[in-house]
Amino acid sequence: MKHTHAQLNLDSLKLGKAQKKKEDNLMKQLRSSMQLLRNCLFQNEECKMAALKAHLVPVLHSLWPWFLTDNSSMQIALHLLCVYTANYPTGCASLCWASGGQSSLPSARSSAGNSLMHSILKLASQLSNDNSPIQQVVFCLLSNLALSHDCKSIIQKSNFLQNFLSLSLPKGGHKNPSSVSTLWLKLLLNISFGEDGQQMMMKINGFLDQIVEMCEYKHKSSQHLALLILHNICFSPTNKPKILANDKAIAVLSACLESDSCAVQRIGAASLWALLHNYQKAKVTLKNPSIRRRIDEAYSLVKKTNTQPEDELHAYYLKCLENIVQLLD
């Protein structure tokens, strides 16, 4: 791949049809190399470490201008990065280094916006409502990277998440989200697994209202993702006052207790328990008669339900409701 990059740069200085054909052949060769490397890296940490030491990220970064002119090569490069970063935090962090991943020293971290991570965010911003194959892969890659503290920090500083607010949400009773919405929800869910991500999202003006609206989707998979994000942000002490001040958010969470879906019931109960935990002011909001009625009815119903002792999810739901009732009493 390094050799191909050098050849591409040398040959780009020449003109003519023969030169164009040679360039096409080099790009074809590059695509084959990336596909082969992707297969070698799949679920293989030893190979990923070897790729890190061989400076895979700086090589891809140097080839980035060529990828931008060729969608097929860009898609394969992004697929390669998806495989490389999956369950490999060191690999994720290497995308943030200004040197292109050749050093793990903090001084090499990128602050000037010249890392591969910045280039990926720029590409994703340009495609934010596109729903092309490249957009799907770039969001898949960002979902991997969002689990890394270093990458999350660059996402925050880049203001990339502001693009979430420009999503056009479907109107009307039977709401079905666009596939772009689902890509965003999967990314945001991964960001919400850490408290830094939970706070980062709540700093975006209008974020909570948008997520709450997406919790009302009829499409079960997307609704579930949105509810999980809302559930996760309830665990941050900094976020609790804002969530409790949002009547619609509390209405959505309490309505979960009346859902036909056991998974949705659990999300609602766990979220309400999280809001109450170590936060006295939450009691005032959750003692609202209509919310309290839903809690008491759900608790009464779950105590009557006969389940197997090994049903851990049911036991967790019961524990959530027991703690909510105890804290409110």
Regions found by a protein language model. Name each.
Residues 53-59, 99-101, 159-163, 206:
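Amphipathic alpha-helical scaffolding segments
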Residues 45-46, 62, 196, 209, ...:
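Positions in alpha-helical segments
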Residues 1, 48-49:
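Alpha-helical solenoid scaffolds in large eukaryotic transport, assembly, and signaling factors
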Residues 59-61, 87-90, 151:
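Long all-alpha helical scaffold domains
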Residues 10-13, 21-42, 49, 53-54, ...:
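Alpha-helical solenoid repeats of the armadillo/HEAT superfamily
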Residues 1-4, 9, 14-18, 37, ...:
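Buried hydrophobic core positions in alpha-solenoid tandem helical repeats
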